[in-house]
Amino acid sequence: MLTEALVAVRQGTQTPAAQTTCAPSTMSSSSRPPLETLQAQSVSADETPGSALPACAQPCETARSATPTGGETPNRSRYLSHRGNSIRQQQGILQEGFLLYSLDKFHETDKPDGIINLGTSENKLCHDLLHERLTRPDMLLLDPPLLQYPDWSGHQFLREEVAKFLTDYCCSPKPLKAENVVVMNGCASLFSCIASVICDPKDAILISTPFYGAITEHLGLYSDVKLYHIHLDCEASGEDGRLFHLTVDKLEEGLRRAEHEGFIVRGLVLMNPHNPLADIYTPKEMVGFLEFAKRNELHTIVDEVYMLSVFDESVTFDSVLSLESVPDPQRTHVMWGLGKDFAMAGIRVGTLYSESRDLVEAVAKLGAFHGIPGTTQRQVAQLLQDREWIDTQYLPRNRSRLKAARSYVTGELRGLDVPYLDRSAAMFVWADLRKFLAEPSFEEEMRLWRHFLKHKVVLSCGQAFSCSTPGWFRIVFSDQDRRLKLGMKRIKEALEEYKDQITVTDCYSIKDGGPRVRASGKDSDNAAIVGSTLPQGKSSDMLEEKDHTVQAGLGADELVLRDCQPSKPAEGLDSLIGTLRHQIRSSDWLEKNTPELSAGEDPEILDVFKALLERARK
């Protein structure tokens, strides 16, 4: 199989005009997640576990998986175990950008030309409010018991305050019990611990894409649990015309595929409000998801870390804990923390509520590795019981500031004619920058992401969230006014410069519901979207000209897709090289595929192999 790929590369190098063709797959190269998800121990709903480099007879498969990584993989260490090397080599696709940011952070006076971070979901709008509250005398108490070992599930006084707080702010129909609460140093630790006790190594948990990419590491690094991706389309679906719409039918299909491919599926992850979409699921939707999990005896991990960051009074968030009856309470586990809603990402506090005594006891056993200092627990308890400050000072001002910041960013995006999901929760906007890509590929998305870095602003691109379609970016707006405005100015400059570098020479649009017409150059700005960029099986007649209502039930709160996209590029040498690069950087690929082995299969391709090896390592 390796030989076939290398022969194809050699032939492609000799005759670049000759391209292998194949019938269209159900998902194009622009609608597939990057292979980093496999490196990060995630599994796509359309990929077979353990699959190797695709053969030449499957060029569509090859191209749709090829995408560059965010940084170089360290060499294997003889001082570490196989697992240790795997952990050491684990890298997020955006690691290079955030490493550069850490070395070149913006500062108003010391480094005004430094990098501005609009990629990390942190609330930086309420430091003044928190400083005033956290420096009051009641926060400075030091009782002797705080200096001793606590209950590993958290001090009793904190678990009691958490239970009361969640009862009130989640509108629980009955008082929640402190004995069902576990407190750890962040929800990342809770994710890892829950996965450890409900799954065995190599088991899988369902999750819809796009999703907060760090969950891959949360579940995989310690527990070796896989994420099985259920890809959601960026096109309108369902009666309400929602984009990236999760349904029970899609969950059923994802579970069926996972089991057909041999995975043991143990659970489901739900985020509400969602990251990065900022969607809020209705109680009816949540009950449907939970009933699906119950039918299939799956645990449901519900992440509600943005539940208090809903800043539109007309929008209602309903916690799972507000339900009169949870379909399967023994397998439903709700997480919340202070990092997002209370703008305390550095004060690592995550809470778990579950009625499963078995799970609570098992997770608490792992608390010895994930505990919170006693003094911090006391401060958090004091904060949570100060309802007057929370209700009259913090929450109203935080929501007002979030709303104003979001309004500014979305106004700037509209000025750039950039579509986005119109939501009123969390602290980021999911923006559609597909029209700025020279071609609909994850390689091009990464080039645009690096172009933002060049302009000293770091964002998070869609492939970091395993988005199935390239060109989507998450823009965090919960930052101080000066940094936010300067960051958006840099984004605007980067996009204008990048767009000037792209010449759209041939694309199609649909005007007035009529037949396809040619569009090129500046004229394409009046077009809706290219039919060729729509996912396979989607009809291009769903979309009309910009500034007009979109057909097929697209709601008024949804984005309108605009402008012309270039057609999908032909499969070629770069796609194969991209795939080889991913395989080479995996943990044991080099051990299994050496130049000598390839020479044994076909001595003539040894030089080709070595040349590709050098290119892939660059």
UniProtKB/Swiss-Prot annotation:
Alphabetical UniProt keywords: Pyridoxal phosphate
Keyword Oxidoreductase: no
Residue span of region Disordered: 11-54
Entry annotated with the keyword NAD: no
Pfam families: Aminotran_1_2 (PF00155)
Residues annotated for substrate binding in this entry: E122
InterPro entries assigned: Aminotransferase_I/II_large, Ethylene_sulfur-biosynth, NHTrfase_class1_PyrdxlP-BS, PyrdxlP-dep_Trfase, PyrdxlP-dep_Trfase_major, PyrdxlP-dep_Trfase_small
Disulfide bonding pattern of the chain: none
Gene3D superfamilies to which the protein is assigned, alphabetical: Aspartate Aminotransferase, domain 1, Type I PLP-dependent aspartate aminotransferase-like (Major domain)
Source domain of life: Eukaryota
Residues with PTM N6-(pyridoxal phosphate)lysine: K340
GO molecular function (one): transaminase activity
Listed Low complexity bias regions: 11-26
Chain intervals with Polar residues compositional bias: 27-45
Transmembrane segments: none
GO BP, sorted A to Z: amino acid metabolic process; biosynthetic process
Family statement drawn from the similarity comment of this UniProt entry: Belongs to the class-I pyridoxal-phosphate-dependent aminotransferase family.
Protein name in UniProt: 1-aminocyclopropane-1-carboxylate synthase-like protein 1
Naturally occurring in which organism (per UniProt): Takifugu rubripes (Japanese pufferfish)
Source taxonomy: Eukaryota, Metazoa, Chordata, Craniata, Vertebrata
